[in-house]
């Protein structure tokens, strides 16, 4: 009942509607859209029954010594009237212990990207289809990997969950194997070879 959505269509997928209880998403990719800030988000649907199999969730049901013995599974519903002990514990314990929070400036940058998310995702998906179709005409490419391909491992799920666009990630297998791939990367002039994805920039 978890959904890790870093590389998927963030605009219309809505994993909670399909049964996910907790959704984790990278803010650095499509949401930020500009690659200037690193961040992530956790969304707790409040739909998960933490009372079942309590032994599997000791962080929720065992007394937390760092909070005077509080039992999050009991305390959060009593104090807030909500079923979100996971996200409350994440905020007050993990945030306290790890300091994993955005600075005000990085938060501002993420919000700036969020304002144009719906427009960018639609265009990302349209562009990806065009690029896929173009790459399929190249005699230097062995295979184009995309979620809509009939032989794609992801096609069934893409058709089921990605109603407003099939995502914007494209993979290719070059003829010539590893050496051809190295040569391709080394000779890029327009594209940047980076680890990040989902930006309004040209990356590979």
What is each stretch, according to the model?
Residues 1-7, 11, 202-203:
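Single conserved hydrophobic/aromatic residue that forms the stacking wall/gate
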Residues 7, 19-20:
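As written
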Residues 12-13, 31:
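Conserved protein kinase catalytic core
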Residues 22-169, 173-200:
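Active-site C-terminal subdomain of aminotransferase-like
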């Amino acid at each position: 009942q978890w959904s890790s959505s870093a590389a998927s269509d963030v605009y219309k997928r809505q994993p909670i509607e399909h049964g996910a209880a907790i959704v984790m998403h990278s803010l650095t990719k499509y949401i930020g859209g500009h690659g200037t800030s690193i961040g992530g988000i956790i969304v707790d649907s409040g739909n998960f029954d933490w009372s079942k199999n309590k032994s599997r969730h000791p962080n929720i049901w065992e007394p937390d010594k760092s909070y005077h013995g509080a039992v999050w599974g009991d305390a959060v519903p009593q104090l807030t009237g909500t079923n979100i002990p996971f996200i409350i514990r994440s905020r007050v314990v993990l945030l306290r212990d790890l300091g994993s929070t955005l600075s005000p400036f990085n938060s501002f940058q993420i919000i700036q990207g969020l304002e144009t998310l719906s427009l960018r995702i639609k265009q990302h998906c349209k562009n990806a289809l065009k690029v896929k179709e173009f790459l399929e005409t190249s005699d230097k490419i062995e295979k184009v990997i995309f979620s809509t391909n009939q032989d794609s491992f992801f096609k069934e799920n893409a058709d089921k969950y990605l109603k407003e666009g099939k995502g914007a990630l494209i993979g290719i297998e070059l003829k010539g194997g590893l050496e051809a791939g190295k040569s391709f990367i080394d000779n890029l002039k327009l594209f940047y070879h980076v680890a990040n994805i989902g930006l309004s920039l040209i990356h590979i």
